[in-house]
Amino acid sequence: MDYVTQSPWIVTLIVAATTYCTLRWVQYWRSWVNVPVVGRRGFLGSWISTILWTWEARGCIQKGYEKNKDFAFQVSTPNGWEVCICNDDMIKEYKNLMDDQMSALAVTSETFQAKYTLPGADWDAVHKLVPQPALAKSLMWLRNRAANDTDPYFADFVKTFQRAFKEEIQVEQDGAPFPCFPRYSRIVAALTVKALLGSLENRPELIDLLCEYAEAIPLDGFFIALFPAVLKPIVAFFCKAPRLSDRLVKVITEEIARRELENKHRIPEDMTDWMAQWVKDNPGYCIESAVVRVIATFFGGIHTTTQLTVHTLLEIATRPEYVDPLRQEITTALKTHGGWNKSAIESMTKLDSFIKEAQRFNPLDAASLARQATRDFQFSNGLKLPRGTWVFAPNGPMLFDESLYPAGSQFDGLRFWKLAEQTQKPHDYRLVTASSKYLQFGDGRHTCPGRFMAADEIRLIVAHTLFHFDIAIKNHGPRPRNTTFKKICFPDMAAEIMLRPRKPHGSDGN
């Protein structure tokens, strides 16, 4: 005993361990919800489940869905008990609630430790940021411009893509392999810069900065989350994402100031212009509140769009039976509509179906519609959620549910095209369409507003690649296995593909 009392390190360790166990016990009971538990039970069991959550998350959600698909269940995670809502009526009940009841931003903020890594998604500072509806309107404005044949926006978008593709994908005749994810990530970044920052697309150092930032956010966010609140500012100081964020804020703020100096009555040409004008028209917001929102949009646009692009290319490379029908559709679309334009891209319905099936078969997140209860909430069936509870819907399991998607365990690249033909409801099965049975882009109040721009980017990239090149995995091997982390599924970031130029095909596909 004398040794213990004379050793401050041992005393400190005992106090820390006792404090941790006490906090864990409080968290265990405070976040408890009266629904079935999936995984280990009890205080000790839930603690073990929390430790193993990184590896067991997707399996737990699948198991819980199979046993409780008509109600709900809870799983033990580092955030406490998280509740998965499987019942369709209950999902409809919570998905459209206002943020003062169920907040999507609070989940994003905590997941990525946005206070330090992604200020444009910081829940604690939401009152200072340009509101979400304004952000959605700016993206809708871009969507309308893309659909307007008289607006040069989409033609310039295509030119940006063609330049970026030529710079990043330098294909040799022998089809030498190259890493798929980093190359296509830079192409997606160039397109995103074009839409959000216009002329800055021509600055390679900005593309470098954005790609580095997009990679740093999840890594640093997950790392910072491991530490208690008192240590997070110190840990964040040594992380990369906060410094990269500051650099981006400086670059974009200086660009806005330069544009203002050149022309105070500038007509908006990109999302940054639109947001800057919104700040002018709405006193009480500073320009930085718009800039950090734009930066947050970059992150959402680059990383997730690249992932689906890579998933799609890997599926095409290992499913040669789809190559001819997709190429025939692309060729017909280009001839009919006179080249690479919005009308041609929209007419590629089989390609759209293939991309959507690649997304279904490789769901980014096993969960969707993630919300945090910002106050105590009670469903109409009586289920009570204490303030702070995280809830989500079972996105991944639903996508393989045979009652929703017959032969769901099998890849069918024309699945959604055939459903559109059979039902004569093509809109219901497009890549961008969200529904209660397809939650890849969310649903309800917080359906992803950037999905239309993402769809344009992915379809353009995949169509161009397939039209001009034969695609194969390195050494003609099998499809590289996906990687999972907690609820998330990533394509193999190191996967290499081979592109071999096709023989001249005499069409309008320049």
From Swiss-Prot:
Coiled coil: none annotated. Heme binds at residue 448. The keyword Iron applies. Glycans are attached at residues 148, 341, 482. It is found in: Membrane. Its cofactor is heme. GO terms for biological process: mycotoxin biosynthetic process. Its main location: membrane. Pfam families: p450 (PF00067). Pathway: Secondary metabolite biosynthesis. The chain crosses the membrane at residues 9-26. Its EC number is 1.-.-.-. GO terms for molecular function: heme binding; iron ion binding; monooxygenase activity; oxidoreductase activity, acting on paired donors, with incorporation or reduction of molecular oxygen. Belongs to the cytochrome P450 family. This is Cytochrome P450 monooxygenase penQ. It comes from Penicillium crustosum. The lineage of its organism: Eukaryota, Fungi, Dikarya, Ascomycota, Pezizomycotina.
